[in-house]
Every structure is written in C-alpha cells, then in structure tokens.
Amino acid sequence: MKRVAAVIEYDGSNFFGYQGQPDVRTVQGVIEDALERIFKQRIYIQAAGRTDTGVHANGQLIAFNCPNDRMTTEDIRNAMNANLPDDVYVKEVFEVPVNFHPRFDVTKRIYHYFILTSRQKNVFLRKYVWWFPYELDLDAMRKAVKYLEGTHDFTSFKTGSDERDPVRTIYRIRILRLKNDLVLIRVEGRSFLRRMVRNIVAALVKVGLKQWEPEKMKEVLEARDRSAAAGTAPAHGLYFYKVLF
C-alpha cells in the first residue's frame, strides 16, 4: 500500500466547509465518497487545512493511503476527477513517504483574499470576491501589516471557539492592486487560527477606510481580546491558495 498526496481546487460556494459532517455536503465528504467508488472501500483523507463554509481553494493538499499499488499517480488523478462533482478538481497526484501528514508536514500556507472596490456590483463575481465599493488606502494598509508580521499572540484575531495555542507566525502579508478594481491581500504563514485571515482582512479594511490609523493594529494585537478588533470579512473572498512542504 502506497501513500499519495493530491493538490485539489474547489469552489466552496455549495459546501458546508471542508471537514466531513453528517447530513451536509462537505469537501472531505465528496472526496471520500469518490475514493470509495474507485477502491470499493472507505478511504480516509487528511488535509493541510480545514476551510470554512464558502471558502474556496486553489491548492488544498490532501493525503491518503492507496490500496491499489498497480495504479499510477496519473491513474488515480484521472479516476478521482471522473468520480468527483464539477466543483472539485484534482490538479496533481504524487507519492509521499508513508508517514507524511499534510497538516503537520506543511511548512507554509498561503491564503489569498480578493476585494472588489468598484462602484458597480459584478453579479458574476458575487460568490468569489468581497464587493466593497469604497476607496481603500493601500499604503496605510501596507504600514499596518508590519505590526502583524512575525510571531505574535493572535487572540484578537481568532474565533472564540478556537481553543488552540494563539501564538502563530506570519511570514509576510502583501497587498496588491490588480486590474478591474480588484485588491489582493496575500497572507503567508506556517499555520492559522480559525477565521484568523478573515479577521485580519476586516481589520485592514478599517485602516484602508482611514477609520483606524495603521498603528491601531499594534494596539489591537497587544490587547489579546477579540472584541478589540474589527468584524470578520466574508468567507467567499478567501482562497486557500497554496502550501509548501
């Protein structure tokens, strides 16, 4: 039996998040159902991250034990894509060591968040970007992210139900103005708390609107209090873009 990993992408619009749950449609659930059809037995998968309801992925990484040693990685990829719904796609399959675990062996996770600042709504993008028809001061936002980069206690930017260690490391945050009034916020780190990226985006938007000075980010971070921060940016603007390991 060999162990394989797969890079997958999915449109999170019609999923109740990644993690398997009874009686609702999840990314993990549809992948494990597809693998069961292929291998005629239940195959359990592990993932590099558990995206929330409505969050998308370009480069989620999963791993599982393949019970058929005769199948090549290309055979596995083709079989999975033939059995998956059209909002999930396997981009690549490759062999990994038998003890590989995507959650623990990944060294960097990269998230992308898209904000559409045009005055007019784009109905075709409504599930894939946060439509926010206001001018944002990107220079001020870039100053604010410097307080977040590095290793800190991110209690102010976590969801209340997350009981894990709040100390996390953000390697880098980039804020880019793209074509057609799109703003990209790219966040790179080893691991993240639940809704941490979306909570950071909401705080950066406060700075971009000039409701907060960039230095306010340091104050919020040091407060270690969720109520000191802003709200939470919508899920549909967030993409689990890529992992490195």
Swiss-Prot record:
Point out the signal peptide segment. none
A Pfam cross-reference name: PseudoU_synth_1
Please give the Gene3D superfamilies that the UniProt record associates with this protein.
Pseudouridine synthase I, catalytic domain, C-terminal subdomain (3.30.70.660), Pseudouridine synthase I, catalytic domain, N-terminal subdomain (3.30.70.580)
Reactions that this protein is recorded to catalyse: uridine(38/39/40) in tRNA = pseudouridine(38/39/40) in tRNA
Q: Which residues bind substrate?
A: 111
* Catalytic site: 52
Known function: Formation of pseudouridine at positions 38, 39 and 40 in the anticodon stem and loop of transfer RNAs.
Q: How does it assemble?
A: Homodimer.
User: What's the name of the protein?
Assistant: tRNA pseudouridine synthase A
Organism this protein belongs to: Thermotoga petrophila (strain ATCC BAA-488 / DSM 13995 / JCM 10881 / RKU-1)
